[in-house]
């Protein structure tokens, strides 16, 4: 389950930002998660709750903003939304797609006391 390693990294980022601001607690974390990132949102939620135990993030809400997968079709020269790798172009049916967005994962915002 690589989601636990991801959440441990998120907690490290959160703790670093809390130290920088001399704060003591995190109320919420906003995470942008691309649909092509290979991370399951529900697994991320579960692992975040476990990873946050006994840290400044314990009890913090995790808000996940899911970002769509986007690819450039080399056949019809259009930017198209895709649900997963291996999908065909919804415009022309070609499989010659280059992923341009949807693989990202980042901490977008923190609400800190």
Swiss-Prot record:
Belongs to the HypA/HybF family. Zn(2+) binds at residues 73, 76, 89, 92. Pfam families: HypA. InterPro entries: HypA/HybF. One of its GO terms (biological process) is protein modification process. One of its GO terms (molecular function) is nickel cation binding. Involved in the maturation of [NiFe] hydrogenases. Required for nickel insertion into the metal center of the hydrogenase. The gene is hypA1. The keyword Metal-binding applies. It comes from the Bacteria. Transmembrane segments: none annotated. It comes from Bradyrhizobium diazoefficiens (strain JCM 10833 / BCRC 13528 / IAM 13628 / NBRC 14792 / USDA 110). This is Hydrogenase maturation factor HypA 1. Keywords: Metal-binding, Nickel, Zinc. Ni(2+) binds at residue 2.
């Amino acid at each position: 389950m690589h989601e636990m390693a991801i959440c441990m990294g998120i907690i490290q980022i959160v703790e670093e930002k809390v130290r920088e601001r001399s704060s003591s607690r995190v109320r919420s974390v906003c995470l942008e998660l691309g649909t092509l990132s290979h991370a399951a949102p529900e697994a991320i939620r579960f692992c975040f709750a476990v990873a946050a135990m006994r840290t400044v993030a314990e009890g913090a809400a995790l808000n996940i903003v899911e970002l769509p997968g986007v690819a450039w079709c080399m056949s019809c020269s259009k930017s198209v939304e895709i649900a997963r790798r291996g999908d065909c172009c919804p415009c022309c049916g070609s499989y010659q797609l280059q992923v341009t967005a949807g693989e990202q994962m980042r901490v977008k915002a923190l609400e800190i006391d």
